[in-house]
Curated annotation (Swiss-Prot):
Protein encoded by which gene: MT-CYB
Binding site for heme b b562: 83, 182
Cofactor requirements of the protein: heme b
Major location (coarse): mitochondrion
Phylogenetic classification of the source organism: Eukaryota, Metazoa, Chordata, Craniata, Vertebrata
Full protein name: Cytochrome b
Function of the protein: Component of the ubiquinol-cytochrome c reductase complex (complex III or cytochrome b-c1 complex) that is part of the mitochondrial respiratory chain. The b-c1 complex mediates electron transfer from ubiquinol to cytochrome c. Contributes to the generation of a proton gradient across the mitochondrial membrane that is then used for ATP synthesis.
Length: 379
């Protein structure tokens, strides 16, 4: 009798994806973040589902329903903070996952990379809409400012914004539709994740050296399942430390004030994981230019495979490209810091320089470093 995991039509798919999957023997801990993202997604869907059971998407009761969850629902506070801080963990894993793809040249798997970019956009949209739901001051004004950016689109901009709002300002209709989208998008993300994995398993995983590992593969289980479980435990530990000791560390105090359309907070800013893009948006004085720069700051990932001029795939043996990569990481951290600062001297000029450097590093210095390295190696 054949083994059920190899013969059953459904279990067979799981077997080929997570058990008997041939995996390079040398992939490092940077490859753990894909599975950690899967765990974050499952955690967000479960906690979100329980929150949705008690949340009401009406402007008059949304804020108090979140307070009710924290005060009156059994373990509601921990579910709420797991969901809020789970989003931060999700984005930390996302940024590291994308960074690893950049460093080790995983972007040469075009289909996987492009689905990943779509996933990044979808997750960012979901997180933005989730931030609006508690209906605090920063929720309301964040929604107003970000949706208003669409009015920069020539000719149809104003109509588009009012269509998204469902009225002439951010109101009940906006909150209801944001809740509906925030609820459905994670399931769309799950479907996209399956497609992402499908494309990945067509080619097999990349590895740190960037060369073909066909001659040196090992089964995913037990080697990498064990390694992934260790990653899960570390991430859960970090999340629980954050949730149980300082759940408000990454939040905004303004969001504990109910939304008031008549009072603007002194500094409107999004959650920390959007600050780098927000800093790029603010660094351009022109509204349309800022919006385009904001979109391009993420969309630029799509042209990275075209800018790959090196004869080697990975940056593992390319010291010059490594310097450019870590400069880019430092620049993104600078942009994140600037995004949270008020619009005044010296932050304006620092933001503008960091924004120019961000695009220059990707569009000019990365291909240039690769070309110089090729020249050194007489390739």
């Amino acid at each position: 009798m054949t083994n059920i995991r190899k013969s059953h039509p459904l279990i067979k798919i799981i077997n080929h994806s997570f058990i008997d999957l041939p995996t390079p023997s040398n992939i490092s801990s940077w490859w753990n973040f894909g599975s950690l993202l899967g765990m974050c997604l499952i955690l967000q869907i479960i906690t979100g589902l329980f929150l949705a059971m008690h949340y009401t998407s009406d402007t008059t009761t949304a804020f108090s329903s979140v307070a009710h969850i924290c005060r009156d629902v059994n373990y509601g506070w921990i579910i709420r903070y797991l969901h809020a801080n789970g989003a931060s963990m999700f984005f930390i894993c996302l940024f590291i996952h994308v960074g690893r793809g950049l460093y080790y040249g995983s972007y040469t798997f075009l289909e996987t990379w492009n689905i990943g970019i779509i996933l990044l956009f979808t997750v960012m949209a979901t997180a933005f809409m989730g931030y609006v739901l508690p209906w605090g001051q920063m929720s309301f004004w964040g929604a107003t400012v970000i949706t208003n950016l669409l009015s920069a689109i020539p000719y149809i901009g104003t109509n588009l914004v009012e269509w998204i709002w469902g009225g002439f300002s951010v109101d009940k209709a906006t909150l209801t539709r944001f809740f509906a989208f925030h609820f459905i998008l994670p399931f769309i993300i799950t479907a996209l994740v399956i497609v992402h994995l499908l494309f990945l398993h067509e080619t097999g995983s990349n590895n740190p050296s960037g060369v073909s590992s066909d001659m040196d593969k090992i089964p995913f289980h037990p080697y990498y399942t064990t390694k992934d479980i260790l990653g899960f435990l570390v991430l859960i530990l970090m999340l629980l430390i954050l949730v149980l000791f300082s759940p408000e560390l990454l939040g905004d105090p303004d969001n504990y004030t109910p939304a008031n359309p008549l009072s603007t907070p002194p500094h409107i800013k999004p959650e920390w994981y959007f600050l780098f893009a927000y800093a790029i948006l603010r660094s351009i004085p022109n509204k349309l230019g800022g919006v385009l720069a904001l979109i391009l700051s993420i969309l630029i990932l799509a042209i990275i495979p075209m800018l790959h001029t090196s004869k080697q795939r990975s940056m593992m043996f390319r010291p010059l490209s490594q310097c450019v990569f870590w400069l880019l990481v430092a620049d993104l951290l600078t942009l994140t810091w600037i995004g949270g600062q008020p619009v005044e001297h010296p932050f304006i000029i620092i933001g503008q320089l960091a924004s120019i450097l961000y695009f220059s590093l990707i569009l000019v210095f990365m291909p240039l470093a690769s070309a110089i390295e090729n020249n050194f190696l007489k390739w």
